[in-house]
C-alpha cells in the first residue's frame, strides 16, 4: 500500500534504551530528534507516540499508579517533540490534557477510570484528523459503561460504613453497576468486618472491588490523623 504518514512508535524507555546523555530527559529528547530526522525530509505527516511524564502535565492527586511506572525518573520536556510533528500521543498519565498548552501534544486520557482516585475524571477519546490543511483535533466525551464509587468519601468506623451501604440502591448487578470501594477506619479490632460488609451488600446494585481497612496514624505531635490521605492501609 501507499505510505501516507510515519509514526514514531516509542514505548516506555528505560536506561539504555536511549542515547547516552547527562540525564533521562535529555536522552529521551535525543532519541526523538534522531527518529524525526530520519523521516522529516520525506514530506509526509509524522505522528509521535510516547509513554512518559511530560513537564507541566497534571497528575491525579490520589492516584499513586501514575508515579510508579516512571519510578522517580525526570520528567521529559515538551521540547522533545519537534513543532513540525503533526501530533504527539502520550500515555502514562490517565487524565486527558494538553501538554504546556500545545494543542497537538496530548494525553488522551483513559476511556474509563483505572482507579478509584479517577472517579471524577471526564472520560472520552481524542479524534485526530491529519490532512494537507493541517491537524484537526476533536475531544469526544462519553459516559463509561460502569463507573466507580467510594463510600464513605473518607474512612469511617464500621457502623457508619454499614449505614452508608444501606443507602445504596437496591437491585440486580448488571454491566452498568458501579465498582465499589469501601473505606473503613479501624479504631478497634473487628475480625468479622468483611462478613458484615458482604451481608450488607446483598441485594445492592453495586460490584464490590476493594475493602480498604485503615488504621489511624499518629503524628509526632500526638494528633491522630483521620483524613484518607494520612491513613495507613493495613
What does each model-identified segment do?
Residues 1-104:
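His/Asp/Glu-rich metal-coordinating catalytic cores
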Residues 4-7, 125, 179:
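Broad gene-expression machinery/nucleic-acid interaction feature
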Residues 71-75, 114-116, 205-209:
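Gly/Ser/Thr-rich active-site loops/lids in small-molecule metabolic enzymes
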Residues 23-26, 119, 188:
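Residue-level detector of secondary-structure boundary/capping sites
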Residues 78-152:
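A conserved active-site cap/scaffold subdomain adjacent to cofactor or substrate pockets
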Residues 37-38, 77-84, 104, 118-122, ...:
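Short C-terminal domain-edge/linker segments immediately following a structured domain
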Residues 130-234:
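Accessory, non-catalytic peripheral segments of nucleic-acid enzymes
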Residues 30-32, 71, 87-89, 107-110, ...:
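Short amphipathic alpha-helical surface micro-motifs
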Amino acid at each position: 500500500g501507499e505510505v501516507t504518514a510515519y509514526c514514531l512508535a516509542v514505548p516506555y524507555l528505560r536506561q539504555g534504551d536511549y542515547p547516552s546523555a547527562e540525564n533521562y530527559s535529555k536522552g529521551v529528547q535525543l532519541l526523538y530528534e534522531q527518529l524525526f530526522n530520519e523521516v522529516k525530509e520525506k514530506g509526509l505527516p509524522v505522528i509521535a507516540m510516547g509513554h512518559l511524564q511530560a513537564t507541566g502535565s497534571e497528575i491525579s492527586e490520589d492516584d499513586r499508579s501514575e508515579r510508579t511506572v516512571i519510578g522517580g525518573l525526570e520528567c521529559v520536556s515538551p521540547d522533545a517533540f519537534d513543532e513540525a510533528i503533526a501530533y504527539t500521543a502520550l500515555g502514562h498519565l490517565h487524565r486527558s490534557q494538553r501538554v504546556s498548552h500545545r494543542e497537538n501534544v496530548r494525553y488522551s486520557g483513559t476511556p474509563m477510570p483505572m482507579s478509584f482516585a479517577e472517579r471524577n475524571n471526564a472520560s472520552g477519546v481524542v479524534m485526530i484528523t491529519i490532512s494537507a490543511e493541517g491537524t484537526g483535533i476533536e475531544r469526544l466525551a462519553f459516559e463509561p459503561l460502569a463507573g466507580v464509587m467510594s463510600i464513605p468519601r473518607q474512612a469511617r468506623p464500621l457502623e457508619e460504613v454499614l449505614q452508608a451501604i444501606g443507602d445504596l440502591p437496591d437491585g440486580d448487578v448488571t454491566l452498568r453497576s458501579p465498582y465499589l470501594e469501601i473505606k473503613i477506619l479501624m479504631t478497634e479490632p473487628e475480625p468479622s468486618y468483611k462478613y458484615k460488609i458482604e451481608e450488607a451488600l446483598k441485594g445492592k446494585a453495586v460490584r464490590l472491588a476493594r475493602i480498604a481497612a485503615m488504621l489511624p496514624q499518629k503524628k509526632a505531635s500526638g494528633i491522630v490523623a483521620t483524613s484518607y490521605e494520612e491513613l495507613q492501609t493495613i
